[in-house]
Amino acid sequence: MSKYAAIPSPYSHQPQAPDHKSKTLVVGLTGGIGSGKSAASNWFAQQGIDIIDADVIAHEVVVKGSATLRKIQRKFGDWVLNINGDMDRAAVRTHVFTYPDALIELEAITHPAIREAAKLQLAESTSPYVVLSAPLLIEAAEAGLANLCQRILVMDATEDTQLARASQRDALSVQKIKAIMVNQLSREERNLHADDVVLNENDLAALYAQLEPLHQDYLKLAQQLKFAAD
C-alpha cells in the first residue's frame, strides 16, 4: 500500500480559525483532474453527508441577471453576454487565457461571491460534517475556501491514471488534459497541503474501502468540535 493511501500527511493542513460561525466540521475535498473527486463526493453523499460543490456554485453566482454577472459586465463590457443575456463562457475563457491580468480581475469579482455562497450553504447544513469540494481549493488561495475547512482530503492518482480517466470521461485530448494539469499543483505539492490523502488507482470498491475509515474519523472529529464549541 502506498504511504499516501488514506493516511494522515506529515505536512498537515493548519488553517487559521475557520472563517464561519458554524460548529460543523468542514472537510475540504480536492485533487487533480481525473483523480476521483466526483466519485468520492458521491460516496460521502450516500452516507448522508452534505456536499458543497464549488464548481456548481461558480456557475450559480453568474447566472443571468445575477449581481455578480452585472459586475463582470460593468468591468469588461457587454461582450461578456451572449444574445440571451447569459455569460458567454467561451468568450470569457478565451479572453482570460489571452490576457492573464483579466483572469485576476475576473476572480476578484467571482471569488468573493463563491465564498459567500459556500458560507451560506455551510450555515444551512444539517449533516454531521460537510464536504466542500473544490478542484482548486489549494491553488486558488485568494478565494479563501481552504480557510473554511478544518481538514483537507486530497484525492491522488498517477498522471497516467489521470490522463486515462479524463480522456474517457470528458472525451478530451491528452494535450488538453495536460494543459489543464499545468494550471494545477503537482501531486507532490498538493499532498503537502493535505491532512488525508487517498490514492485512487483501482476500482470503486478499493476507493470506498479507503473512504470508510476516514468517514468514521470525521464523524468523531465532528463530535469533538461540537463539544468544544458548546
Curated annotation (Swiss-Prot):
Similarity remark: Belongs to the CoaE family.
Compartments, as annotated in UniProt: Cytoplasm
Function: Catalyzes the phosphorylation of the 3'-hydroxyl group of dephosphocoenzyme A to form coenzyme A.
Gene symbol of the encoding locus: coaE
PANTHER family per record: BIFUNCTIONAL COENZYME A SYNTHASE-RELATED (PTHR10695:SF46), DEPHOSPHO-COA KINASE-RELATED (PTHR10695)
Associated pathway: Cofactor biosynthesis; coenzyme A biosynthesis; CoA from (R)-pantothenate: step 5/5
EC number: 2.7.1.24
Ligand binding (ATP): G34, S35, G36, K37, S38, A39
Record's protein name: Dephospho-CoA kinase
Record key words, sorted: ATP-binding, Coenzyme A biosynthesis, Cytoplasm, Kinase, Nucleotide-binding, Transferase
